[in-house]
């Protein structure tokens, strides 16, 4: 199969939704969770990683099939186009099971999360909470335990903003925009003629945003203001769950959150 990043059909043939040249996303079954892919000439960024070892493995296989098709020229692993054919970086938007438990299968990739996100992924209390949430939402205990056994802390914590250089002028920005949905919310901006913003669960389209016990409601609306500042009026905003939206949708959700929690933005 011949795939070019400029041709949306290549993404769709592999089950992914094209968002911009070199940028796409996959909506996963069961929880309708989004994972994103940003392809550069020398590397690729995955945004979130699925809910289990099995789901992470599927994501990795599909993403790397797409990357190989988009970078058909051979190259040594770790250099030039060779590293552009595999996932070299993973950004975790927040430490909830449906977004992080698949990260353990991306050996060799650099993993990024908001500062402090390592604690709920590696501490005993954090792992117990992750497991309980996963099982309560339908993941089998065995699948949860298998992923948690392999899960490690992110290698890089983002304090403010951090730019990745994926080669070929592809430079996504990782932005610590929270707290809001959790205490550790990371967004990803992919600049371009029409920017793409991966919002994590700060924005949800398929239902009202979910505020669990680890949410920070007093800061959530302000986090959406930061997302709007990142992307601007013309960006494509990618929720953690549901269809892609525009800036007007994000503003409406910000207003709803402000009313719901009695906070300003």
Positions of the model-derived regions?
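Short, acidic/turn-prone active-site loops that include or flank metal/cofactor-
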Residues: 51-52, 115-119, 203, 262
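Active-site metal-binding motif and surrounding structural segment of the metallo-beta-lactamase
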Residues: 53-113, 157, 229-236
């Amino acid at each position: 199969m011949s795939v070019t990043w400029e041709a949306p059909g290549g993404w769709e043939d592999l089950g992914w939704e094209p968002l911009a040249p070199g940028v796409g996303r996959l909506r996963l079954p069961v929880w309708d969770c989004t994972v994103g892919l940003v392809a550069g000439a020398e590397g690729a960024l995955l945004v979130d990683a699925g809910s289990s070892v099995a789901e992470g493995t599927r994501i990795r296989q599909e993403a790397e099939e797409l990357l190989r098709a988009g970078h058909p020229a051979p190259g040594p692993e770790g250099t030039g186009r060779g590293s552009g054919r595999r996932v070299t970086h993973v950004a975790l938007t927040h430490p909830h099971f449906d977004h992080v438990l698949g990260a353990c299968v991306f050996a060799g990739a650099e993993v990024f999360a908001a500062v402090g996100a390592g604690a709920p992924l590696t501490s005993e209390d954090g792992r117990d909470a992750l497991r309980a949430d996963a099982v309560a939402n339908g993941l089998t205990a065995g699948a949860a335990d298998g992923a948690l056994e392999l899960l490690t802390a992110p290698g890089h914590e983002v304090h403010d903003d951090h730019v990745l250089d994926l080669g070929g002028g592809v430079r996504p920005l990782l932005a610590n925009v929270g707290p809001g949905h959790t205490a550790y919310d990371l967004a990803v901006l992919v600049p371009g003629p029409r920017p793409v913003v991966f919002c994590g669960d700060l924005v949800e389209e398929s239902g009202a945003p979910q505020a669990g016990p680890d949410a920070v409601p007093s800061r959530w609306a302000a986090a959406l203001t930061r997302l709007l500042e990142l992307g601007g009026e013309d960006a494509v905003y990618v929720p953690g769950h549901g269809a892609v939206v525009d800036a007007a949708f994000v503003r409406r959700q910000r207003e709803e959150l402000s009313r719901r929690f009695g906070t300003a933005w």
